[in-house]
């Protein structure tokens, strides 16, 4: 039987002897522009804007102009209308067509699918300008990130950096942008989870994520663009730079992402917009929340500390002992009552549902 006890220290100075807290800095970028429609987005909306799947991509491309800039916003279309992703849009178009309550001729569906292919061809032939710090190519937020990365990776170094963003699209676009900008000492990677659904959303397996983390630990990758999946559970002792490109929403996100910086001389950078009171208040809230949480834990009386031995296991297992069980004679495997319910539910869920004709009432 496992016996354990949850313990912490009331004196944080003792904890800092073994676990170092990163040095925190606030990096301000100038006020962002309001979202606007780029020439590419305008032409696609005017020509194919009646297609629901295209409208969804256009909405994000329009939104991306403010935090990311025109280059990233236009490349949303390149991601969403790549060969594999265009087929995903075609399937979405078919599903939306079949969901229509009013009967429409199938020729209308064929015409919509053909227009999706036309949009794909239009984007493929578009002359994308290279990313530039001049004009609206990159937003002030991206330019500030570029400034930090240029300073860190201008020469060979052992810095391991994780850049946290909120959306998978953002991680992919920034990864493409900085790969395009090029730096001999910046080796990029991406950690965005396994969810797969929206157009342009790349499918990444669990194995690929594990390999990415292994390369990051070895130093083959020294800069990761990551979503919230990387906030919890990563133990990389050499990680010494965390950049919150998109600010956290909760105290837990703040503490967990800060905990990824394990190196003795680590930095944690909060990127905020100049004059943005919400960003300033967000930082103030999480810092105050951490103080309140620490005081609460220190104020717990002794009888509320978790010892791990205050549970009567015999009473908890009493019902289980009363239930029957079956032991397979050939393998020795035992099937208990509770586990049999899980097996039965899985079996029933796998059965093919049969539809029977409704009986007429006489």
Positions of predicted regions on the chain:
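Conserved segment of the helicase C-terminal RecA-like domain
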Residues: 219, 256-289
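Conserved RecA-like helicase motor core of SF1/SF2 enzymes
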Residues: 193-197, 222, 228-264
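Helicase motor interdomain insertion/brace
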Residues: 1-181
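Eukaryotic basic, amphipathic alpha-helical target segments in cytosolic regions
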Residues: 6, 153-156, 182, 190, ...
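Long, hydrophobic alpha-helical segments
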Residues: 282-322
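Eukaryotic short linear interaction motifs
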Residues: 170-173, 197-200, 232-233, 250-252, ...
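Conserved helicase ATPase core of P-loop NTP-dependent helicases/translocases
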Residues: 160-164, 170-176, 185-227
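N-terminal segment of the canonical double-stranded RNA-binding domain
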Residues: 309-361
């Amino acid at each position: 039987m496992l016996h354990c006890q949850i313990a912490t220290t009331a004196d944080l100075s003792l904890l800092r002897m073994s676990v170092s807290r990163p040095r925190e800095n606030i990096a301000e970028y100038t006020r962002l522009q309001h979202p606007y429609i780029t020439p590419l987005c305008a032409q696609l909306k005017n020509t194919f804007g009646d297609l629901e799947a295209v409208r969804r991509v256009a909405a994000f491309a329009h939104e991306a102009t403010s935090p990311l800039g025109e280059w990233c916003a236009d490349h949303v279309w390149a991601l969403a209308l790549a060969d594999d992703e265009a087929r995903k849009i075609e399937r979405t178009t078919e599903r939306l067509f079949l969901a229509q309550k009013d009967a429409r001729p199938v020729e209308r569906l064929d015409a919509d699918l053909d227009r999706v292919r036309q949009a794909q061809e239009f984007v493929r032939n578009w002359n994308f300008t290279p990313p530039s710090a001049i004009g609206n190519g990159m937003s002030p937020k991206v330019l500030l990130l570029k400034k930090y990365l240029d300073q860190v990776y201008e020469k060979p170094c052992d810095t391991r950096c994780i850049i946290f963003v909120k959306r998978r699209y953002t991680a992919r676009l920034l990864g493409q942008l900085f790969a395009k900008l090029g730096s001999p000492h910046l080796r990029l990677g991406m950690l965005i989870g396994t969810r797969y659904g929206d157009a342009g959303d790349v499918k990444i397996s669990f194995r690929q994520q594990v390999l990415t983390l292994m390369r990051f630990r070895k130093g083959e990758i020294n800069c990761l663009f990551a979503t919230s999946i990387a906030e919890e559970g990563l133990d990389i002792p050499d990680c010494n730079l965390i950049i919150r490109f998109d600010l956290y929403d909760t105290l837990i996100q703040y503490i967990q992402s800060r905990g990824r910086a394990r190196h003795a001389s680590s930095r944690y950078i909060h990127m905020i917009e100049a004059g943005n009171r919400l960003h300033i208040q967000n930082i103030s809230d999480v810092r105050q929340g951490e103080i309140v949480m620490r005081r609460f834990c220190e104020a717990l009386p002794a009888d509320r500390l978790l010892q791990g031995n205050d549970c009567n296991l015999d009473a908890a297992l009493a019902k289980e002992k009363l239930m029957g069980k079956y032991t397979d004679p050939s393998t020795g495997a035992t099937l208990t009552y509770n586990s049999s319910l899980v097996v039965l539910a899985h079996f029933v869920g796998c059965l093919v549902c049969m539809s029977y004709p409704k009986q007429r009432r006489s």
